[in-house]
Amino acid sequence: IYPVINAQNLVIANYPGFASENENKMEKIYSQSQKALFREIIWPSLVAIERKIDAKLTCMMTPQFDYGDENEPREGEVAYYLKLLKEEYGEAGLSSGNVSGTGLSEKMEKDETFWKKEAPDYCFQSLYLQNEDELGDALECEELDGIRTIVTRESQTSDEPIVSFAGEEVTLQRATGDGVNHTFMDDFRQRCIQTALGYSNTVWDLLAAAYPEKKDDAWEILSKEAASNICTYQKPFTAFDETTISKSDQRIRRFLALSYSAESEDNMISLHVDGLEEEAWFLLHTGTREAEDIQGGSFSVVEDGVYLICAEEDEVKIRLSEEEEKQLFYYED
């Protein structure tokens, strides 16, 4: 028995944008504007995927992608998307993504006026950081004082933790998949992470759809691949909770601070959680035995011999079924 995060995230990075950009390419590929693409095509597709796996969307927004042109972000549209997200029990975050090579600090300084006018009462708590080299800048940026968690792309090395503290008060959540690509090794890695942490963080970056460079970047192809991968490869993990990125942040903080002890005697497992203020989750592997009863919490089946334990009190008692007696067979010549 060991603690897990119990959080499954679906993050849509660089969606939506609010400026009329790349219009010639949009007309050529989609026969409509970027605004119409985001509203009329992409949003219904995202909702269909989200509802199929009962996910909670986190959309990382940006006022614009190109800070080098003269196209300014449109007014009056942020409230529309915030309303849509609220209806789907999702949330919005900020994105550092852009196509003009604008640094994080400069971008956030330019964006601040827009957000204060268009979403004055909305508390953005998350940031999608397209370039992890700018992590230090993100932690020091005054415009990002309210950010509690930072999302980055998948780690390219094995020594970087999936979840951690980026600073004293800010957590870091690395992507565990991009939604579009899913190889055999990707699947193996995802299963390992789910077994160890009860956690996934699919970060689907839609910048390519707004600024397609090749045929496979078109939304029709991107969405088909992503819908297949996300809906298929999340199926084995339905026992875990679907969360927004800020809810995941809360659970990560609880997970990283957790102190517990466990012992077993006969068919009883005793679990003690120090200073439990909210729920905490554990994975219990029982082999061939079954969990029959629990006091101080609840359990659900992940797969045969594996249970997700929700500790609701400091002391949790779990009763397992009696172990079946092994039958020995002897053969005589």
Where are each of the predicted segments found?
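Catalytic grooves of carbohydrate-active enzymes
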Residues: I1-S20, S45-E50, E118, L129-E134, ...
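His/Asp/Glu-enriched short active-site or ligand-binding loop at hydrolase and phosphoryl-transfer sites
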Residues: E143-N181
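Small-residue (G/S/T/A) turn/hinge positions that recur once per unit in extracellular repeat modules
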Residues: G90, A257-Y260, Q295-V301
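Solvent-exposed beta-hairpin/edge-strand motifs
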Residues: L283-G297
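Surface beta-strand/loop "capping" patches
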Residues: E242-G287
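Metal-dependent polysaccharide deacetylase catalytic core of the NodB/CE4 family, i.e.
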Residues: P16-S20, P44-D145, S158, N201, ...
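The substrate-binding groove and active-site-proximal loops of carbohydrate-active enzymes
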Residues: E27-R39, M61-E72, G97-T102, Q130, ...
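C-terminal beta-strand-rich structural cap/linker in extracellular carbohydrate-active enzymes
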Residues: E303-D333
